[in-house]
């Protein structure tokens, strides 16, 4: 029995789809992570006061060695876990520097908002990663119409430092 025209069309679409997906090249990115600023928004409570900021960055990494396991797991290189304080530059791998506008002068804030990115390496032979990271940045209670911006970079497990991105300015009302 001959195939109907619609059946032929579906067969051609399926064969073409499988042929192109089989030929798809794996993602390739440089081994040094690269980031780009996506956005920063204030998350408000029911009274319209900022509770925290949510910043989003995009990233790529060619070998996918982004993020750490929890320190309690014992699966990280010890250099990423100990000491778990400011003397260890690699304890956190999502680095944030805060700038506060005070009397029309941008001043570096001493509060460290850096954090740990969780382990993100994919399974399989192609480890290249592309994605977004969202991070909540706490804000001080009582700030009214204060202006900030942030500089952010990340480290991968090979200690490659990404480029640094600057967020847009944001006015906080907490």
Language-model features, listed with the residues they occupy:
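Polar low-complexity intrinsically disordered regions
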Residues: 1-2, 147
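First exposed extracellular module after export/assembly in secreted or surface-exposed proteins
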Residues: 32-174
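C-terminal motif of bacterial Sec signal peptides marking the signal peptidase cleavage site
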Residues: 19-22
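Bacterial signal peptide processing site
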Residues: 24-27
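Bacterial N-terminal signal peptides that target proteins for export
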Residues: 2-10
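Alpha-helical transmembrane segments
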Residues: 13-17
């Amino acid at each position: 029995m001959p195939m109907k025209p619609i059946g032929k069309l579906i067969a051609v679409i399926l064969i073409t789809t499988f042929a192109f997906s089989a030929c798809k090249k794996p993602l390739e990115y440089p081994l040094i992570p690269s980031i780009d600023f996506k956005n920063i928004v204030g998350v408000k409570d029911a009274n319209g006061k900022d509770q925290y900021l949510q910043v989003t960055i995009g990233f790529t990494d060619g070998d996918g060695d982004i993020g750490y396991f929890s320190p309690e797991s014992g699966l990280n290189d010890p250099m990423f876990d100990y000491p778990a304080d400011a003397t260890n530059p690699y304890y956190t791998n999502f680095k944030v520097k805060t700038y506060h506008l005070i009397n029309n002068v941008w001043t570096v804030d001493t509060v460290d908002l850096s954090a740990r990115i969780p382990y993100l390496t994919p399974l399989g032979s192609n480890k290249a990663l592309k994605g977004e990271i969202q991070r909540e940045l706490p804000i001080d209670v009582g700030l009214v119409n204060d202006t900030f911006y942030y500089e952010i970079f990340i480290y991968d497990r090979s200690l490659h430092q990404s480029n640094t991105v600057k967020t847009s300015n944001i006015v906080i009302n907490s």
